[in-house]
Amino acid sequence: MATLMVQGCTSDAGKSTVVAALCRWFARRGYSVAPFKPQNMALNSAVTVDGGEIGRSTALQALACGVAPHSDMNPVLLKPQTDMGAQVIIRGKVLGNMQALDYHAYKNTASEAVLAAWQDLSSRFDVIIAEGAGSPAEINLRDNDIANMGFAERVDCPVIVVADIDRGGVFAHLTGTLDLLSESEQKRTLGFVINRFRGDLSLLQGGLDWLEERTGKPVFGVLPYLHGLTLDAEDAVDEQGAHDVGAFNVVVPLLPRMSNHNDFDPLRLHPQVNLQFVKMGEAWPSADLIILPGSKATRADLAFLRQQGWDKQIEKHLRYGGKVLGICGGFQMLGERIDDPEGLESDAGSSAGLGWLSMTTRLISGKQLRNVEGRFVAADTLIRGYEIHNGLTQGEALKHPMLVLEGRDDGAMSEDGRVMGCYLHGLFDVPDSCNTILEWAGLKSQRSVDYAVHREQQLDRLADMLEEHLDMTRLKQCMGS
């Protein structure tokens, strides 16, 4: 078994993309390969085959390997709820909420969970491609590090460092990062990968020669900027959508603790849809469909929505015949009240909902985590997705469910048919279900994208790019595989 770790000079340097590319490259050559991310901080997560929860990027990398996502692949997941606190998930299961200082003190215990997960994964796969988090050179985070070099040192695995040249300063990033590492960490660093290059490579060659001479480390490859690459994003929301004249306008309010924004990726690719995220202070655009997204702090995000005056805009939209869809936390907002007696998401208390569905929600411990499929009640079309929520919703509105999932009702639709919502994520991934929702909202003759097929094409594109631009023979030799 060989483990290679991909670290980055900065956040968003391309670590997740490079790991996905490596996973698909090894899988295509018959290796038994799996991704591993010791610690991740993200609001976008996926349900695993063993009933746990991991970061979305790691789940994508598992698909690149051709294996089902498993909790061992991301043993520590932190889901921010406030600027100072997060929900802590260990090996797929919720441990509880912690403030930053409390979690820092807990890291030694978390480190044991990371090591155990890596050992279990290593016993089942030939190759492990591990991914760091942020930068390994964050001086204030080096004590008890489990995300980057702390993990690499403990399991004695080699590391490659990725830098994004498109942002500028790539040589300062790489040399500065290496200089801030300890002697042993520098020794285990095999070399570098430069990501997102555009232009004539011959103009970069002098810099590459200087970098290799100064550091004594090879540049394994310069990866090109891939225009039009669309894969599941994990952190920042890609606010770009189609902007065709006469397109069907889908509007999503950008909430501070918005979660699982990957729900909207198929709409971003839809040739007839103009997907728009409305940010704080922006004018509310014309909309055919408004979608209230999932949230990791539903009551706080609902208060933010009201502070922006967006509730009035949505009410006006409904008054003029528009449609509103709520997903998970957004579904809870559509009801009359949200109760959080245990303070699971923020301070304990209750908040009035938007009141468009006759129902109330109580947040309870014991998160629901499942991959499910079923059918729309009104259209009898297939739906497939996943649930990640703490809410228990009750009320008259549930007598008119939106979905039937494996023999049980889910969601609700208003009597006038203009408002509906459910707990299910992934509503737009299957073309038939995407078409059903868009037709309900008023779009005829839909041409929805099969997102699973699209995702596979993008992963193959990454592996093809790696084949052409990365010296995999040399990298494999350095790995010892």
From Swiss-Prot:
CDD domains: CobQ_N, GATase1_CobQ. The active site is at residues 328, 425. Coiled coil: none annotated. GO terms for biological process: cobalamin biosynthetic process. Pathway: Cofactor biosynthesis; adenosylcobalamin biosynthesis. GO terms for molecular function: ABC-type vitamin B12 transporter activity; catalytic activity. InterPro entries: Class_I_gatase-like (IPR029062), CobQ/CobB/MinD/ParA_Nub-bd_dom (IPR002586), CobQ_GATase1 (IPR033949), CobQ_N (IPR047045), CobQ_synth (IPR004459), GATase_3 (IPR011698), P-loop_NTPase (IPR027417). Residues 247-433 form the GATase cobBQ-type domain. Keywords: Cobalamin biosynthesis, Glutamine amidotransferase. Pfam families: CbiA, GATase_3. Belongs to the CobB/CobQ family. CobQ subfamily. Catalyzes amidations at positions B, D, E, and G on adenosylcobyrinic A,C-diamide. NH(2) groups are provided by glutamine, and one molecule of ATP is hydrogenolyzed for each amidation. This is Cobyric acid synthase. The gene is cobQ.
